[in-house]
């Protein structure tokens, strides 16, 4: 299950959260290696974006909670279809169910 997660952190001074931001990058590395995260990017100005590939919403919930422990934020979560699944869906009856 693919999910795009976009964080909007609390409006703290950037200098006050440098250590937490470094910890977040370290926290992401094993997730990338394991495949739970496919990609991650810093947002211009504030925040981050991550693409998670998880087996369940419970796993996603755990990851977002871990992320929140490092950097408290508001999270926008978008479920995604991979390109092959989207094209397969469109090929069936013109995309109708």
Regions found by a protein language model. Give the residues of each.
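Conserved, structured core segments of small domains
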Residues: 1-97
């Amino acid at each position: 299950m693919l999910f795009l997660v976009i964080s909007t952190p609390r409006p703290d001074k950037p200098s006050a959260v440098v250590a937490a931001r470094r910890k977040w990058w370290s926290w992401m590395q094993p997730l990338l290696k394991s495949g739970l995260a496919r990609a991650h990017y810093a947002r211009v100005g504030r925040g981050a974006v991550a693409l998670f590939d998880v087996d369940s919403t419970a796993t996603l919930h755990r990851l977002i909670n871990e992320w929140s422990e490092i950097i408290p934020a508001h999270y926008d979560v978008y479920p995604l279809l991979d390109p092959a699944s989207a094209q397969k869906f469109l090929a069936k009856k013109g995309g109708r169910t």
